[in-house]
A protein has these predicted regions:
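Post-transcriptional modification and biogenesis factors for structured RNAs
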Residues: 1-357
């Protein structure tokens, strides 16, 4: 993957409704030393003042200011003929900007009219075709600021390259729920959760209601399996994702070795890497470094997890000739010889329940 581009990319939220999403977008921009602005079409400024901060007004921008002062402009949404963010090379210009849209409706129709590029994150789920807007913003900034990185792999049997995912120690149920949503959107049919903080399994009814508010409108499940700190496993390799400058960079690590490999994403606000017995997961353990430009920023688990999942999904790849042959959705690959966990454990979560994360 190439080095960082010289000019920071301004992140613009178009019609964002949820002020907490807006706050997380501001934090995502800070990770990449990027400014962040909002085009307020849905009363965001008022809800921001009422819920997040009455002392720190939301930085706003109009469509006219965006068109006048920024170039190139990237419309970042699932638009017709949008290019993949994987391998995308941003054209030169005085002040680049990437615009992400409303949580439910996406970009307003007048944004693509002033955009120089249309770019999207390839989704691998048949039903859930979007990420949390703040998580998508982090993925956009990660790849665009690094010149796009490698292209999406095209394989005859990509699911044979899909590793297991373990989300470890998330401190907040919304951050964890958004990460599970990302895993489902990127094509995982199951994942493991080490719920040390009790934010997902067995939490109080209010937390469950907040985290899983959307109705079950369809059947598009992901199986969430609990793991425990005292369990030992028999993976061939465990890759631990960290912001610390140790191990191979994320874009250089081989993260598509199939089910014998587990990608562990710890919440580094709650998990001390140095005190963990990583050998309980696999005979081979290596750290993988997710590098971001900023030295100080507000940590959000969903941002780290989604960037990681996006890169793993890129390496796993898509079915050959996806535009002509619809990929067959394989069932999750279980290594029965290892007897990791009983299929009866855990819970099935329908991805439509995660749309509000």
């Amino acid at each position: 993957m190439g080095g960082l581009i010289q000019k920071p990319i301004t992140l613009v939220g178009d019609g964002i409704e949820n002020p907490w999403n807006a706050q997380t977008m501001l934090h995502a921009a800070t990770m990449f030393n990027s400014p962040c602005r909002f085009r307020d079409r849905c009363g965001l400024s008022q809800s921001w003042m009422e819920t997040v901060s009455a002392d720190y007004p939301l930085p706003l921008i109009s469509r006219e200011e965006l068109a006048r002062d920024y170039a190139p402009i990237v419309a970042f949404d699932n638009l017709d003929e949008a290019e993949s963010v994987y391998g995308f090379q941003l054209s030169r210009g005085p002040q680049p900007a990437v615009v992400v849209g409303n949580e439910r409706r996406g970009l307003a129709k007048d944004i693509p009219l002033i955009a120089h590029h249309a770019v999207q994150i390839p989704m691998f789920s048949r039903r859930l075709n979007s990420l949390n807007v703040a998580a998508a913003s982090a993925v956009a900034l990660y790849y665009l600021s690094r010149g796009g990185g490698g292209k999406l792999q095209i394989r005859s049997q990509p699911n044979k390259r899909r590793p297991e995912i373990l989300l470890m120690g998330a401190a907040h149920h919304v951050e964890l729920g958004s990460s599970i949503r990302s895993a489902g959107a990127f094509g995982w049919g199951r994942l493991f959760v080490e719920d040390r903080q009790g934010v997902w399994f067995g939490c109080d009814r209010a937390t469950i209601a907040e985290g899983r508010a959307a109705a079950r409108r369809a059947r598009n499940p992901i199986h969430v399996i609990p793991t425990m700190r005292d369990r030992r496993y028999a993976f061939a390799e465990a890759c631990i994702i960290t912001l610390k400058p140790i191990g191979a960079p994320l874009h250089q690590a081989d993260l598509a070795q199939g089910p014998p490999q587990v990608i562990i994403i710890p919440d580094e606000t709650a998990v001390e890497l140095e005190r963990e017995d990583w050998g309980r997961f696999a005979r081979d353990v290596r750290f993988v470094h997710l590098s971001v430009p900023a030295q100080e920023f507000v940590y959000h688990y969903r941002l780290i997890a989604t960037i990681t999942l996006a890169e793993v999904a890129r390496q796993v790849g898509q079915q050959a000739r996806p535009g002509l042959i619809r990929p067959k959705r394989h069932e999750p690959l279980y290594d029965r010889a290892l007897k990791l966990l009983s299929e009866k454990q855990g819970e099935t979560v329908f991805l439509e329940e995660l749309e509000n994360y």
